[in-house]
Amino acid sequence: MSTLLIELLTEELPPKALARLGEAFAQSLFDGLSAQGLLEEGAQVEGFATPRRLAASITGVRRAAPDRELREKVLPVNIAFDAEGKPTAPLTKKLAALAKSIGADTIAPESLERAPDGKAESLFHRYTARGAVLADGLQAALSQTIAGLPIPKVMIYQRPNGDNVQFVRPAHRLIALLDDEIIPAGVLGLQSGNVTLGHRFLSAGEIIIPHATAYASTLKSQGKVIAGYAERKEAIRAELLKAAGADTVVMPEALLDEVNALVEWPVVYPCHFEEQFLAVPQECLILTMQTNQKYFALTDAQGHLRNRFLIVSNLATETPQAIIEGNERVVRPRLADARFFFEHDKKKPLADRVPQLARVVYHNKIGTQLERVSRLQAIAGQLAEKLGAEVAHASRAALLAKADLLTDMVGEFPELQGTMGTYYARHDGEAEDVALACSEHYQPRFAGDALPGTATGTVVALADKLETLVGIWGIGLAPTGEKDPFALRRHALGILRMLIEKPLALGIAEVLEAAAASFEGIAAVKPDLAAITDFLYDRLRGYLKDKGYSTNEVEAVVSQRPQRLDDIVARLEAVRAFAALPQAEALAAANKRITNILKKTDITIGSVQPQLLREDAERALHQAVATSEPHVHDAFARGDFTTALKTLASLREAVDSFFDGVMVMADDTALRDNRLALLGELHGLMNRVADISKLAA
């Protein structure tokens, strides 16, 4: 199979956009050629992206697409011909347009074939569509690709001939090779060839790509360029790990991607900074190295920051001392700034900063951060009391939770909000759980993030998310479609995770009511607790499905809208165990039938009157329910939901016999009402743990 290589050589591309640009460039070219029939079955594409080039290698490329036999509907016969069988004006006009579109001179009416189209007899034209040749197809695909790239910001630059060109960065060369043959194509004022340039500093002169399959190897050997984005990234990772030795590299993927987009021939060098800077919280030092300098910090086996770091350079040299010293010199003022912020912030206790939160607007309809802190104290205090946590500690933590927003360090690095609050609270002599709550109350920050580790941190985190959810929703900013500017979906998930995973003996209604009460007197906030409750249950469904439970299992439990969620996993596991029983399907179907019967009746269902049980089957069912009921209730009280549901299996025979031999809606109203009462008792028993009718197919 033939291989097509396309490379666009440019000035340095935006680092944060490189991965996306590379993927889009390769995939768009592939899709464009495929749409024209220029790719064989099983064709594959490999993308390349470096700071100075976008490229794609496509295997299975045809020189020309195969011809296609096409059949196109023209017009219904009754419109195409008049009463005398002569062509009408609509037919003449249609044939002229069709001929023009397919490149034919004319199309004679007598050449058309007649056939039914499903509604009426119509005229059809058969013709052969010539397949596109590669040069034309590539030109179309390349132009479409360039026009459709996800470019963050377009530049306007001039070609040597004075023409203005718009692209993400100035483009200098274009390669288009089918195996070893140059395919003529042009874009951005460039014409295709087989010549490129290598590394800006480590390679001199032009490089000829001899064959499309030799692109990556030629660039690597002659140009000092690792063209593959993923290959280069893994090379950086390997070199970092090698240089770290026994230490651990702090290596977030986002930083690795950004550095990867800055180098074509990565080389890792170790550097140092003075130990005195280690007195500053390591989160500050790590963040300043990552954000400002794109350096990789190192920690020891205990997770403590080392006074050395790694840089990824685009220059390979046998005498790297100048590079190392230059980077050490550059990082020193950054670390000194962090130390200054830390020392200056410590001079003012967090508690003294709280009144200044009155100058920080949270939302113009809700008030300032100081007013918000007051609400957090009220909510956290109630929750702490309900859970048996330290109310005073919860209130103190809520008071201090937002104070670090006014510190110099958080002003410089907003990502450190909460983290710095913990350091400053410890310095001020606050209780350890109060200090930890300053950072823990933001948790979980994202899906899969750790939950707060302390009871104080948990209640303040719950209060923070409840206050945001109820307050922002209450001013009419509920999530809509893709818009969720206040991350209410994330806050809702955090609330649910804490209720379930901690677990917490709190009901959904009581925590929402506690939050709503804190907004009393604020006219702009109109909490819609019913809508928020629906929202929480919808998020709960998604959370449980992500945990691996089926839709039926989830609906069996969530459809009952349980208030407390601390036992919801046990209920789900019980439902799963019940569903595996041989009696489950029949009982689920019966429960569904009972539910439908009870929904349709408009009478008040009372208690069962044994003397009105006339049929053997209804007496047997009443006895079976009476026998099972204490066992189900005892198991439920113990939290043994699996046993509670499995006990229902003994009811199957009695339930089947009842529906086979008893007319529920009897003419005698006394008998009817008594049988409905019996079904009501059975329904209550069967749905004590979950609505098992949701398991019915």
Curated annotation (Swiss-Prot):
Keyword Protein biosynthesis: yes
Enzyme Commission number: 6.1.1.14
Signal peptide start-end: none
InterPro entries found in the cross-reference section: DALR_anticod-bd (IPR008909), Gly-tRNA-synth_bsu (IPR015944), Gly-tRNA-synth_heterodimer (IPR006194)
GO BP term, example: arginyl-tRNA aminoacylation
SUPFAM superfamilies: HD-domain/PDEase-like (SSF109604)
Subcellular location: Cytoplasm
Catalyzed chemical reaction(s): tRNA(Gly) + glycine + ATP = glycyl-tRNA(Gly) + AMP + diphosphate
One cellular component (GO) term of this entry: cytosol
Pfam family, one: tRNA_synt_2f
Annotated keywords: Aminoacyl-tRNA synthetase, ATP-binding, Cytoplasm, Ligase, Nucleotide-binding, Protein biosynthesis
GO MF term (any one): ATP binding
Family stated for the protein in its record: Belongs to the class-II aminoacyl-tRNA synthetase family.
UniProt cross-references to PANTHER family, sorted A to Z: GLYCINE--TRNA LIGASE, CHLOROPLASTIC_MITOCHONDRIAL 2, GLYCYL-TRNA SYNTHETASE
Alphabetized NCBIfam families for the sequence: glyS (TIGR00211)
Subunit-level organization: Tetramer of two alpha and two beta subunits.
Identification of the protein by name: Glycine--tRNA ligase beta subunit
The organism of origin for this protein: Ralstonia nicotianae (strain ATCC BAA-1114 / GMI1000)
Primary gene name: glyS
